[in-house]
Curated annotation (Swiss-Prot):
Pfam family, one: DAHP_synth_1
Name of the featured protein: 2-dehydro-3-deoxyphosphooctonate aldolase
InterPro entries according to UniProt: Aldolase_TIM (IPR013785), DAHP1/KDSA (IPR006218), KDO8P_synthase (IPR006269)
Biological process terms in GO annotation: keto-3-deoxy-D-manno-octulosonic acid biosynthetic process
Record's subcellular location: Cytoplasm
Pathway membership, UniProt: Carbohydrate biosynthesis; 3-deoxy-D-manno-octulosonate biosynthesis; 3-deoxy-D-manno-octulosonate from D-ribulose 5-phosphate: step 2/3; Bacterial outer membrane biogenesis; lipopolysaccharide biosynthesis
Family label: Belongs to the KdsA family.
Length: 277
């Protein structure tokens, strides 16, 4: 599948969606986008910058939600213009979709809204690529129904994102078999390595996370075979306004991507025996 100006799929090197969880300021957005562009260009990785103007599903109303759609889109447009990278942001049921689609290159639907048929179809009707996050409560084989809803709009530029599965209270796990199962949809599969180690609501008024496990689950996913990675990153995750416990320090992402590139080449060189069994 051609996504923006590059090919994605299980037989192509992985692409990267990355950036801070939420847009904290114009300065941080430009700084992180510039850094990530340099790293990915040096490694030859196709890159889409991600950051949110509104986090609608925060644990507490005391948590920072974002700068709002107007200011958020202004900053994302500036990132596109000054840094020269494509941008992605997530949208919600009350989002002015056409306004967002006029700025961003790709939209993302939240995992909690994956079963909302009207929402999924309205997003896909905007005619730009959509990264659909699989619900934490959803079986891998059920995502095909969501893909069919998306395809009914005529939009075939759909990727599916695995972000972990609920496992008891405040815990997510990654069932790597699901990555293979979801490939049967024909959609490129993206693995969200940072939200997969989140501990939803685990800190009471905020979510916890195990950022030290990001490389672990990412290496496992690359062994199964994925088309892309989603990773949230920040210069100082402990000071981040949202999802700090599961974000990767930005100065560590280069090392992680190099490892994943090497493993990706080996996995895709030898093919996928499971497809013939």
């Amino acid at each position: 599948m051609k996504l923006l100006d590059f090919e994605v799929g299980i037989n192509h090197p992985f692409f990267l969606i990355a950036g801070p969880c939420v847009i904290e300021s114009e300065a941080l957005a430009l700084e992180t986008a510039t850094y990530l562009k340099r790293v990915t260009e040096d490694l030859g990785i196709n890159f889409i910058y991600k950051s949110s103007y509104d986090k609608a599903n925060r644990t507490s109303t005391n948590s920072f939600r974002g700068l709002g759609v107007k200011e958020g889109l202004r900053i994302l447009q500036k990132v596109k213009d000054e840094v020269g990278v494509p941008v992605l942001t997530d949208v919600h049921e009350d989002t002015p979709l056409s306004e967002v689609a006029s700025v961003v290159d790709m939209m993302q639907t939240p995992a909690f809204l994956v079963r909302q048929t009207n929402f999924i179809q309205n997003v896909c009707k905007q005619g730009i690529p959509v990264n659909i996050k699989k619900g934490q409560f959803q079986a891998p084989w059920d995502i095909g129904n969501v893909v069919n809803k998306a395809y009914e709009t005529g939009n075939r530029l759909i990727t599916i994102c695995e972000r972990g599965t609920s496992f008891g209270y405040n815990t997510l796990i990654s069932d790597m078999r699901g990555l293979s199962t979801m490939r049967s949809t024909g959609c490129p599969i993206v693995f969200d390595a940072t939200h997969s180690v989140q501990q939803p609501g685990g800190n009471g008024l905020t979510s916890g996370g195990q950022r030290e496990m990001v490389p672990v689950v990412a290496r496992a996913a690359i062994g199964v075979g994925v088309s892309g990675f989603f990773m949230e990153t920040h210069p100082n995750p402990n000071e981040a306004f949202s999802d700090g416990p599961n974000m990767v320090p930005i100065d560590k992402i280069d090392e992680l991507l190099k490892t994943l590139q090497e493993l990706d080449a080996v996995t895709k060189k030898h093919g996928f025996l499971e497809d013939s069994l």
